[in-house]
């Protein structure tokens, strides 16, 4: 087990993230899904260059809700992270001149995100605790967990995890429970993630049966990974023009 403090100036960073960084809390989902897609795209690149020789079957990002546990989870089967990766990209945030920068750009969320790569930390806007469970594509590397309650302190442990990739588990704040509603999450995914190049899955498709909607066995894929502008006109169907 490893415990420690994140970076050197995060005592100043977290209140900004929690209260001021984003005027619209829904942005967190876009940021986390974007990171998950990036992890999958990086795996494809490693495969193309011969650095990864494993399977590329069924690459996807999955969003799941557990109302009873109060959690929202974003899962990808991309490159994953080693313990060193987590320490480098999550714990050791190198904020050169962070205080001065935040003072200058505290009203401009996009500038801060672009400058520091703070996308992951947007999770704390809606969460009282965030967990990472991840396993690298690199053979022999143990899976690790990372847990933080929004303070600068974190805890890391080796864990058992069979599959490659990363789970980001958000323990949703009591005053942010709207993000445990599937209809709300699906609407946000369609708004921000409709044209991403990796399947984004939110639960199962539903059908009307015996007076109510029930889940089918088919994944509810939010996005279109082959948009019409990438197709030849001769290959388009009537419904393509409608959708």
Kindly give the residue locations of the regions a language model identified.
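GHKL/Bergerat-fold ATPase module in large chromosome/replication-associated machines
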Residues: 112, 130-153, 174-176, 183-243
């Amino acid at each position: 087990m490893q415990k420690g403090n994140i970076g050197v100036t995060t005592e100043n960073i977290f209140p900004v993230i929690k209260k001021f960084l984003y005027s619209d809390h829904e942005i967190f989902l876009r940021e986390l899904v974007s990171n998950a897609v990036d992890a999958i795209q990086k795996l494809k690149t490693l495969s193309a260059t011969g650095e990864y020789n494993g399977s590329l079957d069924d690459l996807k990002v999955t969003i799941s809700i557990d109302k009873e546990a109060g959690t929202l989870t974003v899962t990808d089967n991309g490159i994953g992270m080693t313990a060193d990766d987590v320490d480098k990209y999550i714990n050791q945030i190198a904020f050169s001149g962070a205080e001065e920068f935040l003072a200058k750009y505290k009203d401009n969320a996009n500038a801060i995100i672009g400058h520091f790569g703070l996308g992951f930390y947007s999770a704390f806007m809606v969460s009282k605790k965030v967990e990472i469970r991840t396993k690298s594509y690199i053979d022999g590397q143990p899976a690790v967990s990372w847990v933080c309650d929004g303070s600068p302190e974190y805890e890391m442990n080796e864990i058992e995890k069979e599959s490659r990739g990363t789970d980001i588990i958000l323990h949703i704040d009591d005053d942010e429970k709207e993000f445990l509603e599937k209809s709300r999450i699906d609407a946000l995914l369609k708004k921000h993630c409709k044209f991403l190049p990796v399947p984004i899955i939110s639960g199962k498709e539903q059908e009307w049966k015996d007076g109510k909607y029930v889940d089918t066995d088919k994944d509810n894929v939010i996005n279109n990974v082959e948009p019409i502008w990438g197709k030849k006109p001769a290959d388009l169907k009537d419904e393509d023009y409608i959708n």
